[in-house]
UniProtKB/Swiss-Prot annotation:
It comes from Thermosynechococcus vestitus (strain NIES-2133 / IAM M-273 / BP-1). It holds the Pfam family LGT. The chain crosses the membrane at residues 16-36, 56-76, 92-112, 175-195, 204-224, 236-256. It is found in: Cell inner membrane. Belongs to the Lgt family. This is Phosphatidylglycerol--prolipoprotein diacylglyceryl transferase.
Length: 268
């Protein structure tokens, strides 16, 4: 029988140094992502140094965008606690905000550097989904982003302070962080396989597959969560996921059915 998951705490003590697991995992995801993207870039005849430069742009844009996205949809709380808006180390970022910020940064970078946006995006996409798989474990250490109550063998124990007020006596919940992390690993392996297939080399393919595959999993998992960002009765992440699936499907239809390239700054 699988034991219930339980976070050891949000911090890691190393002598006189205290690190927050959330921030540490983001840093690990960034460094692994840069390393992998540079390796993939060489296989697509893209200068790895340009990928390193792009990575700075992505980090500078994505992390603040992820935080602002989260704050915007939780403004009822943050307008009364403005001092907490910048306390990103405590958690509270939204991956869709990071993706949007990263896309804007990559669009500007590739335009300035006269690179193919889609070719660069295909190099970055596997690293992005792998980083998401790693980053989800930050939710585990923070005891956040969990799902509905459950008694399954792989249930997640949530401490009393983190439980919803209406479920204060309910201890175990779906480990949605684990579901999404495992799903993202599967998407990562799919993208790596596609990257090596000559028939799927059209620029934009991997980003479109990423948009569809990640969003399918996120739509389902979001339906289990207790803390979804909401706009009225709608779960924002599910709405964004449907839009991403539609855009990804359009992109693949254009590339492989119509045989047309996606609009780009520069022809690869």
């Amino acid at each position: 029988m699988i034991a219930a998951f339980q976070s050891p705490g949000a911090t890691l003590e190393l002598g006189f140094i205290t690190l927050r697991w959330y921030g540490l995992l983001i840093a690990v995801a960034v460094f692994i992502g840069i390393w992998l993207s540079q390796r993939l870039a060489r296989q697509r005849q893209i200068d790895p140094e340009q990928i390193a430069d792009l990575s700075i742009w992505l980090v500078v844009a994505a992390i603040p965008a992820a935080r602002l996205y989260y704050v915007a949809f939780n403004w009822g709380f943050y307008q009364k606690h403005l001092d907490q808006v910048v306390q990103i180390w405590k958690g509270g970022i939204a991956i869709h905000g990071a993706i949007l910020g990263g896309i804007v940064a990559m669009a500007i970078f590739t335009y300035v550097q006269r690179l193919s946006f889609w070719q660069v995006a295909d190099v970055v996409a596997p690293s992005l989904i792998l980083g998401q798989a790693i980053g989800r474990w930050g939710n585990f250490f923070n005891s956040e982003a969990f799902g509905a109550p459950t008694d399954l063998p792989w249930k997640l124990y949530i401490p009393v302070p983190q439980r919803p007020p209406e479920l204060i006596n309910t201890a175990y919940y779906h480990p949605t962080f684990l579901y999404e992390s495992l799903w993202n690993v599967g998407v990562f392996l799919l993208l790596l396989w596609l990257f090596r297939q000559p028939r799927y080399q059209k620029p934009g393919t991997l980003l479109m597959v990423y948009a569809i595959a990640y969003s399918l999993g996120r739509f389902w998992i979001e339906g289990l969560r207790m803390d979804s960002l909401m706009l009225g009765p709608l779960r924002i992440a599910q709405v964004v996921s449907l839009v991403a699936i539609a855009l990804g499907s359009w992109g693949l239809f254009r590339l492989y059915y119509q045989g047309k390239p996606l609009p780009d700054w520069q022809t690869p």
